[in-house]
Amino acid sequence: MEVSDFTAESYDNADMKPFLVPYLVEDQLAAKGNMIVIAGGGYSSRGNAMEGYPIAEAFQDLGYNAYVLQRRVAPYSQEDTWLDMQRAVRYLRYNADSLGLGGMDCIAASGFSGGSGTILGEVANLYGNVQPTLYDADYASDAVDQMSADLDVVCPLYGPQYDGEHTSDYAGLITENPNLPAMFLAVGENDATGAMPDIWTLANSARGKTVVEVHTFAEVGHGFGAGLQGTTSTYWIPMADTFIDLVMGRGEAGVGEAAEIPEGYTQVQQYTFEGGFGKADVTCAVDDAKTKVYMTFVAFDQQQVVEGVLNDGIITVTYDQSGFMTNDAQAIYNAADQNNWQPVA
């Protein structure tokens, strides 16, 4: 890609090549996932000292392989940074075996301000099998580019407008991406850049298409990085970790944990159900005589639990944790394959 307009104010040189700085866990068999970290600084600089390296270290301590993405910045364009993000995701997938990386069922990204925009620009425009030629007609695709660029979870912090401008007509995430990642969003209530109202626009544009969680922190402005001491923003990284566990189905509130199934249920199966609340991965359990049923899944951004008694396959709901699922319970149970029950482990 030919780049011009390098000046004394340019942050990157003409020969800048983006790269990843790895923070790998010792035991790759125990790796929880792979977290790409993108520091802020708009599209003109990289604030790695506050929003890059400390974040990667924190996620590494929690059991993730973490990587600080050194994306191209000014005078490179915002589209160039999105391409760098896309390449980073594909690089990890392509090289996972040769590098011996674990946790490849979860590729996530955390970004701050312009780093947030880098993530969202990739999610909106360079997802899945979309090729870099979308923005660079001269780009020569290689084997790495045949990998999916989809992310599983994203944590965009205080920077939802990914086109580089904070405008009053911001409409959120405009995309045809059919596989939106789960979104953990966070912003300070005193953020003067416009990120505070924008984050709700972003959240609302993604609701019903993926799992979305939003946190706003009191007495916190723009650029809090790992958290501003003396405020609850210092908890965002462990909260993001819990969120990832939730959506990946491995935490206490996750879907598919055999330990969650109450005593008395002996057969279980998992399947996908799509209803008025969207698409959900359901864990459904019954007893041997099929006289009672237990179902758990995520809907309306929270864990749902429904229990009931069965009479010839007809459910009478006896417990509905949220109070919203009783009317859907029969349809959810009917979606189970009655020939595919497995013993509860």
Language model regions located:
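Short beta-strand/loop motif that positions the catalytic acidic residue
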Residues: 184-187
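N-terminal cap/lid segment of alpha/beta-hydrolase-fold proteins
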Residues: 1-29, 78
